[in-house]
């Protein structure tokens, strides 16, 4: 009998699916021990299931320990209630144990993350192997993918005492097993919320320290290969994650993390370090033995420099030259030598074709990470049979492939010369292709992956009725197989079923910035739409019929509300929908579509579906890390008498820099003015020339302009040149505590380091009032000149009634309708995996219905509100509107929380309401607030939506303010700023 423990507590409705996935296994001789508390939401589900299936035994008062003690089966596994067991899993696993007699079997698993499924494999299949022979099985073993003798689960790591987490118990099973099987069959799927991965450094660093210490102690009596495997595959990655949290944690926990590292890590002379990459070795040594300054330097460099390591060929072999080693002390030389783990051969196959029936022509790229392709030999490609025999061997010809730099993400090396072409006789039977490259008397090998694009086969020409086909196998590797005589040519995969298909055959960008797609369809008699779909929004266009069965559609990429990033390409008709399939001409490497407003990249997935990435209009070289690094290092020439302006790192055409730009142009500035934009959808102030962030003209303007004006930080690499002047306008009077004043852990290490470099480079800081000056200087550690005065951006509030009604007309709001502007600040807790989130603690739909007002929702760019779910015309998403000042003029009342917009809107004299339902959490935990906010503020504070609705009804019933703004303070401050800029341009010392 097989016993399956299912941990249902906290899984909610997912628990039923987990239990049913066990009951539906073809292996019928099993019992389910469902661990669930009587008060848990899943208890009722478990009771109902148990009433209909006697194989289920609820364990109402206990935990996994108690359930294992109750198990009647000789074999056991543990399933989390969030997860599911895949069909046929237990038959495959028990069958393997019957054949081998091993104590445990480990299968492959699949992580169902927000970014899509990710397969977690054992290294390869093994039968009755000892753990020291297969230490790679310690790479994050998943409980539900491990089936073992029940006694192993009962005694796993028992000597350590205390409660045991699921990953700890699972590793204990592997350590206790005499022999193990491993399968490449997927047997288990787990998702966010599951207990199988164990505690995370982000959510519970102390628990992860506990786990690491216990695993380290448990492994102390094991053989060196097992201890090394545990360090490489489990403890090392856990300690790296803890190291990344160290600067954000309270001192007591940070010290605990360092002690944990010291207790686990071996001496520098130990060979156990050899399985880790160089920068991980350096980080962990510094964590255990270095100072805080060096630890922060190493952690910061992993983001600022990347985790790529430049390698050069020296007299004694390869030498690692990561720049961070020049900035820290005390790392033993044994840890900085090049190990096998530091040498990774990367291979990409762009396309395959045939020269006759037997010769396969392969085009792709192959390079060793960190090594200049000029320092290596040409790739050697071998066809290898199932028995390991080499069937053919050819030296490839090198060619250029600029795409390799984009894929590599390496700032220190170019792999543009790593392309190859080779023609290899494939032999008669099944074969795989293997690449090898030599460098410094070392040979590195790897199997060639399947070609880019879908998993369709590429058949050879027929000779005497015999053909062969190149295709991707189940592991994503390139293989060649014989086709039986008369076998039909394999069709492209289709996720849409046999009746409805929309096939993409052409793609391009129009001059106007529209993505023009064309193709053919089958099984669709009526019309249909093409859609770009992502978690952040969708773009829709009707497919226009052309000739019979063909269509064309233009998707507008120029709307500022269309976020950049990846989208799936789908079709939708009145009664059906599905994923678009790529046609043969687009099935392969990514198709680059260059535009002037935005660019796009079309990608074919393995299942034949298509994705589109919407990007800034940059070249492939400008998008690559190497290309950017070369632009950073390039000499851009002497300074130019000109002004470079940027708002929110190029995302905006507004705020203080835009008002300063407009003022300079209106007063006839006789110097070039450059405006930084993320892409061509960002509005550019009149009189300025747009430069796209990351482009060569942008680098040149930023590096050569005499005056730089920004309201945010500049890139991390930026360093002001002699003679340049930098005006920091900032972007609001601070309410949220900033930088050095913020709560511990609220500000990332990378941002702290960036600001520590950039704040001393400011020549003038703007502050809206004296309190803002004090808080900004305190938070930033700034000691330079400060100009106190009304913000330039509030020149946008001088438009009065004319602009008010103009904006209302643009938004479709009647002139006399009451209008509420809801403009909350951002919250870290709302950020999802894609950077988006719900973005609101307010039910805008209910607010509009209960107040009779139109609600304008202005979400922060860090927490985009998902407007497609509002379902009411009275709620309008204005997050993408270019000028918040226009929205303030259009509104009768402002609702906000901890946003500096209150100090701007207050100039209109109209009502403001502070809505802070999460005040304690935000003020005391997440961020911290200045000056007794919001209780000490001049505006009413409400904590619930019902209170808010009552206050707003009263405010809207009162006579409306004219909203006129005194122009003098704004214009006077603009004049002072203009004089400062002109003096700076003319080489005078600004006043």
Predicted regions, residues:
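Cell-envelope/extracellular polymer assembly enzymes that use nucleotide-activated donors
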Residues: 1-5, 31, 168
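Short, acidic, metal-binding catalytic loop of nucleotide-sugar glycosyltransferases
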Residues: 20-29
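Short aromatic/hydrophobic "clamp" motif used to bind/position activated sugar donors
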Residues: 76
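Donor-binding/catalytic cores of nucleotide-activated saccharide
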Residues: 84-203, 213
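Conserved catalytic-core segment of nucleotide-activated headgroup transferases in glycan assembly
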Residues: 114, 652-668, 779, 791-869, ...
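Basic, ligand-binding patches in group-transfer machinery
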Residues: 247-642, 666
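A nucleotide-sugar donor-handling region in carbohydrate enzymes
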Residues: 617-629, 733-834, 861, 961
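Catalytic binding pocket for nucleotide-activated donors in carbohydrate/polymer assembly enzymes
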Residues: 788, 870-873, 900-965
């Amino acid at each position: 009998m097989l016993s399956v423990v299912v941990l249902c507590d906290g899984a909610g409705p997912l628990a039923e699916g987990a239990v049913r996935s066990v009951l539906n296994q073809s292996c019928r001789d099993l019992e389910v021990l469902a661990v669930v508390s009587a008060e848990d939401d899943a208890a009722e589900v478990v009771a109902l299931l148990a009433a209909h299936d006697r194989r289920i035994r609820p364990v109402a008062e206990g935990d996994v320990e108690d359930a294992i003690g109750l198990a009647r089966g000789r074999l056991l596994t543990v399933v989390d209630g969030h997860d599911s067991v895949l069909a046929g899993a237990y038959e495959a696993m028990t069958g393997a144990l019957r054949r081998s007699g091993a104590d445990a079997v480990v299968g492959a698993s699949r992580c169902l993350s927000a970014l899509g499924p990710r397969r977690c494999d054992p290294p390869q299949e093994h039968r009755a192997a000892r753990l020291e022979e297969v230490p790679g099985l310690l790479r994050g073993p998943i409980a539900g993918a491990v089936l073992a003798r029940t006694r192993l689960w009962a005694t796993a790591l028992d000597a350590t005492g205390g409660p045991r987490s699921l990953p700890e118990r699972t590793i204990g099973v592997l350590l206790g097993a005499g022999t193990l099987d491993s399968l490449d069959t997927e047997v288990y799927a787990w998702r966010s919320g599951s207990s199988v991965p164990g505690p995370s450094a982000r959510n519970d660093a102390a628990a992860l320290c506990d786990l690491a210490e216990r695993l380290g102690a448990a492994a102390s009596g094991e053989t060196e290969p097992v201890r090394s495997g545990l360090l490489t595959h489990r403890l090392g990655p856990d300690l790296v994650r803890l190291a990344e949290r160290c600067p954000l944690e309270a001192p007591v926990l940070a010290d605990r993390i360092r002690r944990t590292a010291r207790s686990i890590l071996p001496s520098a002379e130990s060979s156990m370090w050899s399985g880790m990459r160089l920068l991980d070795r350096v980080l962990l040594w510094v964590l255990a033995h270095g100072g805080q300054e060096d630890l922060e330097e190493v952690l910061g460099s992993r983001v600022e420099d990347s985790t790529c390591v430049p390698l050069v060929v020296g007299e004694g072999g390869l030498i690692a030259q990561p720049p961070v080693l020049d900035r820290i002390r005390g790392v033993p030389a044994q840890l900085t030598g090049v190990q096998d783990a530091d040498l990774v051969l990367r291979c990409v196959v762009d396309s395959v074709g045939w020269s006759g029936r037997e010769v396969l022509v392969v085009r792709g790229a192959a390079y060793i990470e960190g090594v200049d392709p000029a320092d290596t030999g040409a790739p050697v490609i071998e066809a290898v049979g199932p028995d390991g025999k080499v069937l053919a061997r050819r030296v490839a010809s090198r060619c250029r492939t600029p795409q390799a730099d984009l894929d590599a993400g390496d700032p220190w090396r170019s792999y543009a010369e790593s392309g190859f072409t080779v023609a290899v006789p494939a032999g008669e039977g099944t074969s795989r292709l293997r690449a090898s490259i030599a460098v410094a008397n070392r040979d590195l090998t790897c199997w060639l992956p399947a070609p880019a694009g879908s998993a369709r086969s590429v058949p050879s020409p027929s000779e005497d009725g015999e053909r062969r086909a190149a295709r991707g196998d189940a592991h994503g590797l390139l293989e060649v197989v014989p086709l039986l005589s008369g076998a039909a040519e394999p069709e492209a995969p289709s996720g849409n079923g046999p009746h409805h298909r929309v096939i993409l055959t052409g793609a391009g960008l129009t001059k106007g910035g529209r993505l023009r797609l064309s193709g053919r369809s089958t099984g669709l008699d009526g019309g249909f739409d093409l859609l770009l779909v992502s978690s952040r929004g969708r773009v829709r266009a009707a497919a226009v019929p052309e000739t019979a069965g063909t269509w064309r559609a233009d998707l507008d990429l120029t709307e500022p509300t269309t976020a950049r990033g990846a989208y799936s390409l789908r079709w939708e008709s009145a009664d059906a929908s599905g994923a678009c399939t790529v046609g043969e001409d687009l099935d392969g490497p990514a198709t680059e579509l260059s535009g002037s407003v935005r660019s796009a990249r079309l990608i074919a997935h393995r299942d034949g579906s298509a994705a589109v990435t919407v990007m800034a209009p940059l070249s492939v070289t400008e998008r690559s890390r190497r290309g950017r690094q070369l632009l950073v290092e390039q000499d851009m020439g002497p300074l130019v008498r000109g002004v470079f302006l940027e708002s929110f790192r190029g995302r905006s055409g507004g705020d203080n820099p835009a008002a300063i730009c407009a003022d300079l142009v209106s007063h006839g500035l006789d110097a070039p003015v450059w405006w930084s934009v993320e892409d061509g959808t960002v509005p550019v102030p009149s009189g300025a020339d747009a430069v796209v962030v990351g482009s060569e003209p942008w680098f040149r303007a930023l590096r050569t302009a005499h005056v730089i004006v920004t309201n945010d930080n500049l890139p991390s690499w930026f360093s002001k040149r002699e003679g340049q002047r930098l005006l920091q306008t900032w972007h609001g009077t601070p309410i949220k505590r900033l930088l050095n004043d913020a709560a511990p852990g609220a500000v990332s290490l990378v941002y702290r380091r960036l600001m520590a470099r950039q704040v001393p480079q400011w020549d003038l800081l703007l502050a809206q009032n004296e309190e803002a000056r004090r808080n900004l200087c305190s938070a930033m550690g700034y000691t330079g000149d400060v100009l106190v005065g009304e913000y330039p951006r509030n020149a946008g509030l001088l438009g009065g009634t004319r602009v008010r009604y103009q904006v209302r007309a643009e938004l479709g709001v009647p002139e006399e309708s009451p209008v509420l502007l809801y403009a909350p600040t951002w919250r870290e807790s709302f950020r999802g995996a894609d950077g988006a989130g719900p973005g609101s603690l307010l039910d805008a739909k209910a607010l509009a219905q209960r107040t009779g007002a139109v609600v304008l929702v202005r979400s922060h760019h860090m927490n985009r509100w998902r407007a497609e779910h509002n379902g009411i015309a009275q709620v309008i998403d204005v997050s993408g509107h270019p000028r918040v000042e226009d929205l303030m003029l259009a509104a009768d009342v402002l609702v906000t929380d901890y946003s500096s917009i209150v100090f701007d809107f207050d100039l209109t004299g109209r009502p403001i309401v502070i809505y802070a339902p999460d005040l304690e959490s935000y003020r005391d935990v997440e961020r911290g607030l200045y000056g007794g906010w919001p209780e000490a503020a001049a505006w009413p504070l409400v904590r619930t939506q019902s209170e808010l609705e009552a206050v707003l009804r009263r405010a809207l019933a009162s006579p409306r303010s004219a909203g006129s703004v005194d122009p003098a303070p704004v214009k006077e401050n603009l004049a002072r700023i203009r004089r400062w800029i002109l003096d700076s341009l003319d080489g005078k010392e600004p006043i």
